[in-house]
């Protein structure tokens, strides 16, 4: 496995966990300051904010990283810089327009009824500067990632979250005596301050990037015009943006279909709301948390594949693909089994909602499929095929709608039917991606390695199931949960080594600890 993108994956994974931990603590504290009503006012502005970010910059960071990596592979440092300059100009314009639209359109959004809560005015205008700065940092992150440097992105994410939380909590507490609308608006200011802090971090790393004069390499090939670069940037970024829009679209379709079909199945409205919350508000966030590693891998693999693709290094593309899929198996299969076996204590300890066990157990199977989908999407994007994952997601979405409509209305399945529809949706999209990966790289699936992962995780699952239930009357739930989880991961590694699914070379390729295996 290529140690470069492994290192980047580890760095982004650590940053992802840190950011989520800070965010979780912040949400608890902010809820205590604002209360339920204040949080509701604060949340009212976010759909518009996210929509404007989608319009102004979504998909651009990955597109910039692809174009930058291609030029660096050919030692065209000047071309890479031109990509950045043109992208930065475009994003400055779109970000500025979107920011102004949010600020000056706040009154209209409320008076037209698009935002029903008039007290959200301050939250809307407070988020306007964040739109501008987020478009800037998306440009810098994409460019620096094109150099296959993930540390700047990771540090900027942590700094952004820290500043956001400090300002959010401080401003909310200071402005609370002036009323909930002012306090919610103060909390919204944190997004802009955090984004500006991230921009300063990225600016520092930008000036530390290697210059063409310091590399000793020169490029004498053809140079693309600004129009050609802009055209390629849009060609890449638009499909990537559409892919990111598919996720909220799926959530909205769930909202339209699942509650209605649960009612048709005979569930009362209060239970329908409760069951829907178990799936979308509890089970799905756990799946997203369990795939932090593959989400990071999907980001770091894009420039690595683009670099090899630009050099027409077919063996390099195959090796990077095989290496990333190997890591995907190890990052998803054991966590799928862990969440399935430990679903009850997980939802009880985190949410105090033991009834969410069924939805969580079923949805746990999507950890593997989501991880495969994330990484294969990154590979296809690196191969300049960003439209393929979007089409595949569209096809799988149709399947999900059909399954949601049919399975959820079966009384004995209920919310379990919706959970199975979610698994089928992401599983089919992952399978379609794999078919195209086979077409363009020659790699499909290492069945032997996958089987070793499944056997190791299966044996682990049986042993931790027995261990957890044996210790139930001996240890408190939280201690039993932590001990069993650690025990499970250790068992998985040991069994993988015994089955020769893990070896010394795997250890040697790992960042930080690799030197101990050499």
Protein language model regions, located:
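Alpha-helical transmembrane segments of multi-pass membrane proteins
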Residues: 115-139, 352-376
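Short membrane-interface helical motifs at transmembrane helix boundaries
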Residues: 97-116, 334-352
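Membrane-interface helix-loop junctions in multi-pass transport and translocation proteins
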Residues: 151, 162-200, 205, 387, ...
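Membrane-proximal transmembrane or re-entrant/amphipathic helices at the cytosolic face
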Residues: 466-518
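Membrane-interface junctions at transmembrane-helix termini in multi-pass inner-membrane proteins
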Residues: 134-156, 365-395
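Signature of the first transmembrane helix
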Residues: 4-65, 70, 92, 99, ...
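Helix-loop junctions and terminal segments of transmembrane helices
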Residues: 58-73, 284-315, 325
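N-terminal membrane topogenesis motif
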Residues: 1-22, 78, 82, 221-247, ...
